[in-house]
Amino acid sequence: MKLRGLYAITDSQLLAGRFLSHVEAALEGGVCLLQYRDKSDDAARRLREAEGLMKLCERYGTQLLINDDAELAARLGVGVHLGQTDGPLTPARALLGRQAIIGSTCHASLELAAQAASEGASYVAFGRFFNSVTKPGAPAANVGLLEQARAQVKLPIAVIGGITLDNAAPLVAHGADLLAVIHGLFGADSAQEVTRRARAFNALFAS
């Protein structure tokens, strides 16, 4: 599977009361990867929501990933995204199998990206590139890092952190394969606007 396009990431608080409707609206507009991100301890709700997302993703032909929970990913037969505090990728790869999509947060570090690649990552994620509500204290990345990564890392590159339709185009131009977006997509007032934004993000890869 070619990993290129919009990488939508859910936020349970942002999507409260409109979770599945807004996610389906994004899928309608076109999503390469969908990450279920929920940091709560409510395991039953997380399983229920992840199962609902899996059904939607199957309908739209989108790959689902679970944030920071390889066991839940294995239970559902989907991929996982791991941060730097979640341990090495090797156990997750052993648990999920060779075909699973496994992503790794690399902040602004080419060294972390090289390590992730050696451990079997499917893609690496750099960021934050702009001010981010979700990760305000994350190390800053820039297009110079992106260009270096493009030359050195032989994996798809995701970019994250405050990405909107107003600032995403230069990231694609400098080598980003995946635009990882939360508020810039799901912060829309209506499902129709979510779909419009998804299509507009994808259009950046067609030009």
Curated annotation (Swiss-Prot):
Q: Which GO terms describe its molecular function?
A: magnesium ion binding; thiamine-phosphate diphosphorylase activity
Give the pathway annotation.
Answer: Cofactor biosynthesis; thiamine diphosphate biosynthesis; thiamine phosphate from 4-amino-2-methyl-5-diphosphomethylpyrimidine and 4-methyl-5-(2-phosphoethyl)-thiazole: step 1/1
What does the record say about how the cofactor binds?
A: Binds 1 Mg(2+) ion per subunit.
EC number annotated for this UniProt entry: 2.5.1.3
Q: Which enzyme class, named as a word?
A: transferase
Report the domain of life of the source organism: Bacteria
One term under GO cellular component: cytoplasm
Q: Does the keyword Electron transport apply?
A: no
Q: Which reaction does it catalyse?
A: 2-[(2R,5Z)-2-carboxy-4-methylthiazol-5(2H)-ylidene]ethyl phosphate + 4-amino-2-methyl-5-(diphosphooxymethyl)pyrimidine + 2 H(+) = thiamine phosphate + CO2 + diphosphate; 2-(2-carboxy-4-methylthiazol-5-yl)ethyl phosphate + 4-amino-2-methyl-5-(diphosphooxymethyl)pyrimidine + 2 H(+) = thiamine phosphate + CO2 + diphosphate; 4-methyl-5-(2-phosphooxyethyl)-thiazole + 4-amino-2-methyl-5-(diphosphooxymethyl)pyrimidine + H(+) = thiamine phosphate + diphosphate
User: Looking at the keywords, is Magnesium present?
Assistant: yes
Q: List the Pfam families.
A: TMP-TENI
List residues binding Mg(2+): D68, D86
Cofactor dependency:
Mg(2+)
Q: Which UniProt keywords apply?
A: Magnesium, Metal-binding, Thiamine biosynthesis, Transferase
* Chain sites annotated for binding 2-[(2R,5Z)-2-carboxy-4-methylthiazol-5(2H)-ylidene]ethyl phosphate: S132, V133, T134, G162
Identify its protein family: Belongs to the thiamine-phosphate synthase family.
Name of this protein: Thiamine-phosphate synthase
Protein species of origin: Pseudomonas putida (strain ATCC 700007 / DSM 6899 / JCM 31910 / BCRC 17059 / LMG 24140 / F1)
